[in-house]
Amino acid sequence: MALTVKEEEFSNTLIKNASAFDRLKLGNLKNLKIQKKLQFLYLILFVLITGVFFFFLIGNFYSHRKLYQVIKNTKHTTIGFKIDRPHDKVLSSVLKNKLSTYVKESFKFFKSGYAQKGYLGSENDSIELDDVANLMFYGEGQIGTNKQPFMFIFDTGSANLWVPSVNCDSIGCSTKHLYDASASKSYEKDGTKVEISYGSGTVRGYFSKDVISLGDLSLPYKFIEVTDADDLEPIYSGSEFDGILGLGWKDLSIGSIDPVVVELKKQNKIDNALFTFYLPVHDKHVGYLTIGGIESDFYEGPLTYEKLNHDLYWQIDLDIHFGKYVMQKANAVVDSGTSTITAPTSFLNKFFRDMNVIKVPFLPLYVTTCDNDDLPTLEFHSRNNKYTLEPEFYMDPLSDIDPALCMLYILPVDIDDNTFILGDPFMRKYFTVFDYEKESVGFAVAKNL
């Protein structure tokens, strides 16, 4: 029997089916159109991201350029310095030790109501809050005719200048710039033994005299050569500074020595016995110390002065308002060495509980939600003026932990029952003048350069 196979029977039914073939072509066309639309969207997204990036770069460039021009054109000696922020180290440690979940879950737990409402820490917490409150302004200076370089902490809370000596055999001194008296022709021997104590420990050594240089200013000055810094460990070894340049008052000094700025004025090296701090809003890791005059381009609006109420510290009288909580005639210390606003514990705990602020157990972190509308503008009233500090200046998002959570730069510190410290958050909003001759502190709103 003959078997006949027709061509149309052999052909693929999909090809034979014209409607199916048409649908296939239509589908390909649709996919092509979708791909083109996606490519177009990707292009738009790329342009937007690139535009935002370049806008940021240009804005940052012009911001730094404005600041550079101010510093370049100022008539007064201005020294840039780095700021070592302890909260950065805490957050870095949290991330390094994978404690992000612990922070988030601690906040949820204490907010849930299953535990003590508004947990604010206990005596069992292992990290001292005083440590995280410490702030360091690092700036360069030189000693001797051969300009031996040192990195100083500019500290308004102390009044002596010290550097480590080549005769220092402490562990921390092994990594520091060491002062060598034999290398300087302007060195004058004193040799009087001395020790000076700080909250973190005591240093020991002896007095010497040599030429101190800060920027384009220089003067013969009596300082301490430190030979023993063991009590400062482990802070000293783990920090960048070599020594401390005290910017406090003579009566606070060991040896009754005039502060560097006062001595510069006595020797007619500067016009006024004052110094100022400008902390840029856009960069929390740098600042500028100006000696001998006031650079008006660092601030805007009026510059107002508050009379000191103490002969040892830059301390003034203020009525302080944390929302409904008020401390009348509080002592307010303006301090470059404090990273936060501090307040007496009993006062601050009431405020924190009302504001739904929680302390993370065993960590020096006080946190709340970033959208916490209960947080008020802090107010500081003098007899004639009012200074304010909005939440944006005293809180920051914990972006790498939980973007919904913010930490507060307000800490409980008990100097006594009515003393507050106005540290970095306050000085970042307000350009600050420390005036020895007027025995006053001046404030003006800092420009965002």
Swiss-Prot record:
Catalytic activity: Hydrolysis of the bonds linking certain hydrophobic residues in hemoglobin or globin. Also cleaves small molecules substrates such as Ala-Leu-Glu-Arg-Thr-Phe-|-Phe(NO2)-Ser-Phe-Pro-Thr
Spans through the membrane: 38-58
Record propeptide residues: 1-121
Active site, renumbered: D155, D335
Cellular component, GO, one term: vacuolar lumen
Keywords noted in UniProt: Aspartyl protease, Disulfide bond, Hydrolase, Membrane, Protease, Signal-anchor, Transmembrane, Transmembrane helix, Vacuole, Zymogen
Domain Peptidase A1: 137-444
All ranges on the Cytoplasmic side of the membrane: 1-37
Activity regulation statement: Inhibited by KNI derived compounds KNI-10333 and to a lesser extent KNI-10743.
Paired cysteines (S-S): C168-C173, C370-C406
PTM per Swiss-Prot/TrEMBL: Proteolytically cleaved into the soluble active mature form by cysteine proteases in the digestive vacuole of trophozoites. Proteolysis requires an acidic environment. Autoprocessing or transprocessing by other plasmepsins such as PMII may serve as an alternate activation system.
Disruption of the gene: reported phenotype: Quadruple knockout of PMI, PMII, PMIII and PMIV causes a decrease in proliferation, an impaired proliferation in an amino acid-limited medium, a reduced formation of haemozoin and an abnormal accumulation of endosomal vesicles inside the digestive vacuole.
Membrane-topology annotation of the record: Single-pass type II membrane protein
Predominant cellular place of this UniProt entry's protein: membrane
SUPFAM superfamilies: Acid proteases (SSF50630)
Lumenal side: 59-449
Family: Belongs to the peptidase A1 family.
Function, as annotated: During the asexual blood stage, catalyzes the cleavage of denatured host hemoglobin (Hb). Digestion of host Hb is an essential step which provides the parasite with amino acids for protein synthesis, and regulates osmolarity.
Quaternary data: Component of the hemozoin formation complex (HFC) composed of falcipains FP2A and/or FP2B, plasmepsins PMII, PMIII/HAP and PMIV, heme detoxifying protein HDP and falcilysin FLN. The HFC complex is involved in hemoglobin degradation and detoxification of heme in the food vacuole during the asexual blood stage.
Protein name: Plasmepsin IV
